[in-house]
Amino acid sequence: MARIKKRGTTGNAKNFITRTQAIKKLQISLADFRRLCIFKGIYPREPRNKKKANKGSTAPVTFYYSKDIQYLLHEPVLDKFRQHKTFAKKLQKALGRGEVSDAYKLDQHRPKYTLNHIIKERYPTFADALRDLDDPLNMLFLFANMPATDKVSAKVVSEAEKLCNQWLAYVAKERCLKKVFVSIKGVYYQATVKGQEIRWLIPYKFPTNIPTDVDFRIMLTFLEFYSTLVHFVLYKLYNEAGLIYPPIIEKSIGLSGYVLQDKDAPLKKKEEKNDEEGKNLSKKELNKAIKADQEQQENDEQDNNNGESVEDIELDEFTSTKEDSLLQPSKYASSTAELFSKFIFYIGREVPLDILEFCILSCGGKIISEIAIDDLKINDPEAYKKLNLSNITHQIIDRPKILQKVPGRTYVQPQWVFDSINKQELINVNEYAAGETLPPHLSPWGDAGGYDPNKEVEKEDGEAEEDTDEEEEEVEIEDGDEDQEDEEEEEDEDLKAQKELELEAAGVKFSEINEEDKKSHSKKSKGTSNKEADEEKELKKIMMSNKQKKLFKKMQYGIEKKENREKQLTKKKKQLNKKKEQLKKLN
């Protein structure tokens, strides 16, 4: 006889473990367990049968895979957490006894851990790290915009801000930016780095109200892991681009405060110094060299006079042809990389400088801001007088009227920059002039429901009549049965014959009558084809199982919902277009 298996030794009971059991097994606190799970990427699992997994109990419990918890037992960070626990006890005892010097010594030898090995485990290739960079960047930009509080220290905020600026500096330098979208939440950017599309959100720099119900301990744990990952990625990117990491920080604000130096720059400086040292020779050495050259020339002339006369031979002249020279490819592959390379932008004080600065620099443009000129006027008046502003091609403003226009400048609103980047070409400036009503700023990633307003505009004019005809056909087909339709067709033929006789008597051409017949015939053929398709659907439904029918109903519900939404949006658009036309007529 086979042995009877004990209950709870196989299946779900063995594969899953509860959170309390996992904490007991690892011998750490709940807070440390959460931190460890975040670092290692372990998350709760949902067993198919909770009752079996919980050994008969139906109480609400969080489950994890037993193998994941077994994997955590050998983690070096776990050992550091235990060391920190003993360190905290010793420090508390020393402070309780009043031994300040001992407490200070203990604090200096505080156990520290690194997440480098975890980053290498979770992201074996660089492409994996880049693919997972969306969430880390969103988190870093969120904390960079937050004020320092008792929960979030100023050090954390400054570190997040530094990493964000380093990332933006790299994207601007390598010109990786592809898409921009200004929304209510903030500004969405998309860049292509090493073939991977990375999208992140930068919130607006408004005073933020920090909610009380947010657990900042968990968020700070995620931030700790993400900042380590971004450090790794930036180091690799800067090295591959031949730039020094971390970049040198200047006192000036914005991206211009990060000077990106090449690694070869110090070597070039050394070579230049060596050349200068070679040039600074003494006068005596130079005179000796000149005398030696003169003596050599005299000897050569004597040899030429003593030698036999040689016939003068005309040598062929080889001229360099431009046809042989090949066009070198551009350093930047994307079409947006050199979009604004020929332009210099003057940004007014009413426009958000940080957003436009990043966008324009990423597309090869140059910037002069009104705020920087005002600072220069106060701090260095002599440099301000020498400043040349005649090279400015575009001025970005966000005001309804301009009192004084500078000749030679093109005045545009900020949206022109964003729309030009999204369309990857320079858009006509007339629609974006000062005081003009701007066109809608659409998302470059499209609508989640599949609605595309640009396509609808193309279809609106030509297909408006066809849509109404199709609606009438559907109404006609739905009424009546097949027998009634046959009778109607016979009646229609009699009516046609009568109409033809009447039209001939009135003097109408036969070709015009044929055209009308063709239109009516096409309508009927469309109606019959739709009916056949519906019949096929019904037959297919009959062959389906109950499970498949339910799934099909859900699918149809989703499709109908999308279609209704599209219809509502198109109706709204038509109404808006009509109102615009009426206003134009009135004006």
Swiss-Prot record:
Family, similarity comment: Belongs to the pescadillo family.
Compositionally biased residues, Acidic residues: 295-311, 459-494
Entry keyword set: Coiled coil, Nucleus, Ribosome biogenesis, rRNA processing
Disordered: region residues: 290-311, 437-587
HAMAP family: Pescadillo
Name listed for the protein in its UniProt record: Pescadillo homolog
Keyword Kinase tagged: no
InterPro entries for this protein: BRCT_dom (IPR001357), BRCT_dom_sf (IPR036420), PES (IPR010613)
Gene Ontology cellular component list: nucleoplasm; PeBoW complex; preribosome, large subunit precursor
Gene3D superfamilies cross-referenced by the UniProt entry: BRCT domain (3.40.50.10190)
Any coiled-coil regions, as ranges: 267-306, 470-587
Biological-process GO terms, alphabetical: cellular response to starvation; filamentous growth; maturation of 5.8S rRNA from tricistronic rRNA transcript (SSU-rRNA, 5.8S rRNA, LSU-rRNA); maturation of LSU-rRNA from tricistronic rRNA transcript (SSU-rRNA, 5.8S rRNA, LSU-rRNA); maturation of SSU-rRNA from tricistronic rRNA transcript (SSU-rRNA, 5.8S rRNA, LSU-rRNA); negative regulation of filamentous growth
BRCT domain boundaries: 335-434
Primary localisation category: nucleus
Ranges of compositional bias, category Basic and acidic residues: 529-541, 559-569, 578-587
Assembly notes: Component of the NOP7 complex, composed of ERB1, NOP7 and YTM1. The complex is held together by ERB1, which interacts with NOP7 via its N-terminal domain and with YTM1 via a high-affinity interaction between the seven-bladed beta-propeller domains of the 2 proteins. The NOP7 complex associates with the 66S pre-ribosome.
Domain of life: Eukaryota
Coiled coil keyword on record: yes
Subcellular location: Nucleus, Nucleolus; Nucleus, Nucleoplasm
MF (Gene Ontology): large ribosomal subunit rRNA binding; ribonucleoprotein complex binding; RNA binding
Disulfide-bonded cysteines: none
Function: Component of the NOP7 complex, which is required for maturation of the 25S and 5.8S ribosomal RNAs and formation of the 60S ribosome. Required for the transition from hyphal to yeast growth.
